[in-house]
From Swiss-Prot:
The lineage of its organism: Bacteria, Pseudomonadati, Campylobacterota, Epsilonproteobacteria, Campylobacterales. Involved in protein export. Acts as a chaperone by maintaining the newly synthesized protein in an open conformation. Functions as a peptidyl-prolyl cis-trans isomerase. This is Trigger factor. NCBIfam families: tig (TIGR00115). The gene is tig. GO terms for biological process: 'de novo' cotranslational protein folding; cell division; chaperone-mediated protein folding; protein transport; protein unfolding.
Length: 451
């Protein structure tokens, strides 16, 4: 074996090797013997099949297994020469050449190594943080909203006309071309006007109706409607209004506090205001982080934390981004890429910068998470997906299974870890007085929920 190994940098190495044809052929008998012990061929007892017959019938498999053995031997020798073990690798080596010549094989491969990351410049990367403290006006607005959310609906007199924020009980049925359509009918359906639970034009058509009244009205489904068979279609709806209920106003006082903070002993309006202030503070912080500071922090980490990246992982990320992009392309563009290898290569190459940044940030986040002992439990991943399913009207178990089948659970967990690491760094950079506010408010702010 003629082997040459070159370490390009701390995260990359390359090997080139030449092996004689005999190196491959000498493996045939041993591999054929292994196959002969397992296969069953008519006319022969198991384990008694002649090697000549096995070699003839399983020639392709024997040659493939021999090549794989030869490649593994080359890699083993390359690792030994580099002074590395499997634990030092990141991903699998990328075989870039395996070519058979007249007398020998030529093999080339790129090897990715776990990068060395120094985190001594992290503090320089974290932008200054200042969260808006909720003022009295914002607190009062939230208290009014809570009073509205927790108000009970009560029956109204027969003369009342339906208005926004009323709760209606209706029967409805929709028709397209004089025929009912799937999902277009319901009885004793509860709808809060103005909630956008139904299409805006549907809710507007109910304004001013009275209990016992029936009404017909046309409605055009939006062109981007989620049910494709209805998108852009004109429909006729027939509606019967059975009941109108209005919210019974709640006063903002200690009684409201006892309703909102039902699990809190001796709840008072003063305590409720403190809880509201805490929740608003956390909301302001989350908005500032998500809309501005996290992206700024990521840009700084990318710029200031310098280390060698394994090119094999960057190439894999480019492949992933390219494949994902294909799903959102028009059929004509996909066809154009399929017909031109040069165009496809150029398109894939356009993702190199994004792939490099993504790989780099992932390594940095992983290193920070280990250093600060920040993690995410599998149950938290499932809870996140369960919430996503509830918000999108999907079956939670089906959604989780879909993520599992597509090997996407690890990506969800990594995204959650990234979010926690970035928030942790930003929280540490809050002014001291705001850190104290955060520590005081964090345990209690989640106790306030919508009614």
């Amino acid at each position: 074996m003629n082997l040459e190994v070159k370490k390009i940098d701390t995260a990359n190495a390359r090997l080139s090797a030449k092996l004689s044809i005999e190196n491959l052929e000498k493996r045939y008998d041993k591999i054929a013997q292994k196959i002969a012990q397992k296969v069953k061929i008519d006319g022969f007892r198991r384990g008694k099949v002649p090697l000549s017959l096995v070699k003839t019938r399983y020639q392709a498999q024997i040659e493939q297994d021999a090549q794989e053995e030869m490649i593994q031997e080359v890699l083993k020798n390359a690792f030994k020469e580099l002074g590395i073990e499997n634990k030092d690798l990141i991903g699998s080596p990328n075989l870039t050449k395996f070519e058979k010549k007249d007398t020998h094989f030529e093999i080339e491969a790129d090897i990715g190594l776990k990068p060395t990351i120094v985190l001594d410049k992290i503090k320089e990367c974290v932008p200054s943080v200042g969260v808006e403290i909720p003022n009295e006006e914002k607190i009062n607005e939230r208290l009014k909203q809570l009073a509205k959310d927790y108000a009970k609906f009560v029956d109204t007199d027969a003369q009342r006309k339906a208005q926004n924020d009323d709760k209606l009980t209706i029967d409805f049925e929709g028709f397209i071309d004089n025929a009912p359509f799937e999902g277009g009918k319901a009885e004793n359906f509860n709808l809060i006007l103005g909630s956008k639970q139904m299409l805006e034009d549907f809710e507007k058509a109910l304004l001013g109706m009275q209990a016992g009244e029936e009404k017909e009205f046309p409605l055009t489904f939006p062109s981007g409607y989620h049910a494709e068979h209805l998108a852009g279609k004109e429909a006729l709806f027939k509606v019967k209004l059975h009941q109108i209920q209005a919210r019974e106003a709640l006063e903002i006082n200690d009684e409201l506090a006892k309703i909102v903070l039902a699990n809190e002993e001796n709840a008072t309006l003063k305590l409720l205001k403190e809880r509201v202030e805490g929740q608003l503070f956390l909301e302001n912080k989350a908005r500032l982080y998500n809309e501005e500071l996290k992206e700024k922090l990521i840009e700084n980490l990318d710029e200031k934390i310098v280390f060698d990246l394994p090119k094999t992982i960057i190439e894999q990320e480019m492949d992933l981004l390219f494949r994902n992009a294909l799903y959102s392309m028009q059929a004509e563009e996909v066809k154009s890429l399929q017909e031109s290898q040069e165009k496809a290569k150029e398109k894939r190459e356009s993702f190199r910068n994004d792939a490099t940044k993504s790989v780099k940030i992932t390594f940095i986040i992983d290193a920070l998470a280990k250093e600060e002992k920040i993690g995410v439990h599998d149950n938290e991943v499932f809870q996140t997906l369960y919430y996503e399913a509830m918000m999108t009207g999907q079956n939670p178990e089906n959604l989780i299974e879909q993520y599992r089948k597509n090997n996407m659970l690890a990506a969800v967990k990594m995204a959650m870890i990234e979010d926690r690491v970035l928030a942790y760094l930003l929280d540490k950079n809050l002014p001291k007085e705001q850190q104290e506010i955060l520590e005081k408010m964090r345990p209690n702010a989640q106790k306030i929920q919508a009614g």
